Amino acid sequence: MLATRVFSLVGKRAISTSVCVRAHESVVKSEDFSLPAYMDRRDHPLPEVAHVKHLSASQKALKEKEKASWSSLSMDEKVELYRIKFKESFAEMNRGSNEWKTVVGGAMFFIGFTALVIMWQKHYVYGPLPQSFDKEWVAKQTKRMLDMKVNPIQGLASKWDYEKNEWKK
């Protein structure tokens, strides 16, 4: 009895220790959503924060150069300053994406797959159509309803001319 308790205690201790070790394996830093975030949107053209949060040494030097006259900056430097602040220009934001092709392709795949399933069901699952679907059967059924004078006021029998044996015009 004592041996089983010892093994049980050792087993529980080993499991709990390994769980604790695994739990502290990596630390995930969560994003603080109370701070403003960068977003490229046409309806929100000036985001609260810059696109690049941590500047490199060359970008810091360029930011210092920006404080002087802008006429001394080259076109490439102006573009690089713009890219520090914004990820995309309005032309790039307005550019159409090719996502619609993926959506249409996926929809067509599922429509085609559904068509294959329906064809398989018609061939292997469903039996032949009942005889009541034949045109001859429907004609006989209609003739019988006319002979019985079904619904003579507003229905089928009211539209049949019994003297001429044809539909009223």
Swiss-Prot record:
Q: Which Pfam families match?
A: COX4
CDD domains linked to this entry: Cyt_c_Oxidase_IV
Pathway field of the UniProt record reads: Energy metabolism; oxidative phosphorylation
Species per Swiss-Prot/TrEMBL record:
Homo sapiens
Mitochondrial intermembrane topology ranges: 125-169
Those parts of the protein on the Mitochondrial matrix side are 23-98
Q: Which GO terms describe its biological process?
A: cellular respiration; generation of precursor metabolites and energy; mitochondrial electron transport, cytochrome c to oxygen; response to nutrient
Name of the featured protein = Cytochrome c oxidase subunit 4 isoform 1, mitochondrial
Task: Reply yes or no: does the keyword Phosphoprotein apply.
Answer: yes
